[in-house]
Amino acid sequence: MNTIHLRCLFRMNPLVWCLRADVAAELRSLRRYYHLSNGMESKSVDTRSIYRELGATLSYNMRLGNGMEXEPWLKAAVRKEFVDDNRVKVNNDGNFVNDLSGRRGIYQAAIKASFSSTFSGHLGVGYSHGAGVESPWNAVAGVNWSF
């Protein structure tokens, strides 16, 4: 997979409340052949994605006792996908056109927490909906331990 991703953030009032404007663009090209264990296979000439995104994130930084910090945040963005002709052949049975082009809204909410100078974590949920595409609710969780 080849990916070029550019994201610019503009931070306003970074002390307690923070509003970040977000501009992103991406060009992605994925692999061409997939074979599943149930015998299904797909072949594509090229799977591409070119989009631009404009959004804003609002966060609130809370300093808790014992050196802990928590930062809940909300993000809303609009993404415009330009590629509309990703052709895929599934099981050698004709062509399928994977058209993900158009605008979609992206909505996310999460919380980041620093438990110590070396241990932190995050929890988040997201949803996306737009022309021809709906990404159902998803959740992410992670921890970071640095030493």
UniProtKB/Swiss-Prot annotation:
SUPFAM superfamilies: Autotransporter. GO terms for cellular component: outer membrane. Coiled coil: none annotated. It comes from the Bacteria. Transmembrane segments: none annotated. It holds the Pfam family Autotransporter. PANTHER family: AUTOTRANSPORTER, C-TERMINAL REGION OF AIDA-LIKE PROTEIN. This is Putative uncharacterized protein YcgI. It comes from Escherichia coli (strain K12).
